[in-house]
UniProtKB/Swiss-Prot annotation:
Its main location: membrane. It comes from Xenopus laevis. This is Regulator of G-protein signaling 9-binding protein B. Residues 1-230 are cytoplasmic. GO terms for cellular component: membrane; neuron projection. The gene is rgs9bp-b. Belongs to the RGS7BP/RGS9BP family. GO terms for biological process: G protein-coupled receptor signaling pathway; negative regulation of signal transduction. Residues 251 are extracellular. It is a single-pass type IV membrane protein. Signal peptide: none annotated. Regulator of G protein-coupled receptor (GPCR) signaling. Probably acts by regulating the activity of some 'R7' family protein (RGS6, RGS7, RGS9 and/or RGS11).
Length: 251
């Protein structure tokens, strides 16, 4: 019986590590996609605004929703396991808080994109409504988000004429429902979740490292000043000696 219990415990720890690694990988991918979506959203209404930009926003938005849905299911299943140890549950709760915060930021960006799209509708002639903002091609930004996982999309833009505001409304509602469903299925109180590291320790380590750098720079500067001063004194002494020798020879 003891050997059996040890074997079951080992299998449980292996499964937890696997789920944890999958969740961390999915979180990293979601962070990249949400960051790319925010970067693309900043160009709406500017000189880089185009039908292709709106389509890249749509595809990046779909990718973020797929990653969020996959990660939500994994975290929900893992946190509802009653056999989890206290330490394992705390680690999953930290991932849960990180995931929900990222999802809320994505929801806010989607609302901003919707409002900007309504305020600055794209014309059928593909001309920017406002001649300001950043310039350049945005396809490289979106490609970093779309290459996170191997999911095939059509290269042809789906919205040639105008942005489908109804589709964005449905996607915003879908993300909103996902956040509500997360809070209903798993009761994780954010204010009870503790971080792995303390902010004071990070600030202290940063301050210590910066202090060491400043001290080393001051020491090097002081050494340079001392060497320069010694050289000047040596030259003055040599000049004085030469003048004395010259006067002595003349007299």
């Amino acid at each position: 019986m003891p050997l059996q219990n040890v074997k079951v415990a080992d299998e449980g720890s292996v499964n937890f590590q696997k789920v944890k690694e999958e969740c961390i990988t999915a979180m990293e991918s979601l962070h990249k996609v949400v960051a790319c979506y925010r970067h693309l959203a900043l160009t709406i209404g500017g000189s880089s605004d185009s039908i292709h930009l709106r389509d890249e926003l749509r595809r990046t938005r779909e990718r973020a929703q797929e990653l969020a849905l996959s990660n939500r299911n994994k975290l929900t299943t893992a946190l509802r396991d009653k056999k989890l140890s206290k330490k394992d549950r705390e680690e999953l709760e930290r991932l849960w808080v990180e995931f929900s915060s990222c999802l809320e930021l994505f929801h806010n960006d989607m609302c901003k994109v919707y409002e900007l799209g309504m305020a600055v509708p794209h014309s059928a002639t593909n001309k920017p409504a406002i001649q300001t903002g950043s310039t350049g091609n945005t396809s490289a930004i979106a490609s970093r988000a779309l290459n996170v996982q191997n999911i095939n999309y059509s290269d042809s833009p789906a919205n040639k004429a105008s942005l489908e505001y109804q589709e964005i409304e449905e996607e915003i509602l879908k993300v909103d429902n996902m956040i509500t469903d997360m809070e209903m299925k798993v009761n994780v109180l954010r204010w009870t979740v503790e971080a792995n590291t303390r902010m004071n320790d990070e600030l202290k380590s940063t301050h210590d490292s910066s202090s060491v750098v400043l001290l080393s720079e001051e020491e090097s500067n002081s050494k340079g000043c001392c060497s320069d001063g010694q050289l000047i004194v040596f030259l003055l002494l040599c000049g004085t000696a030469l003048v004395a020798i010259t006067l002595y020879s003349i007299l």
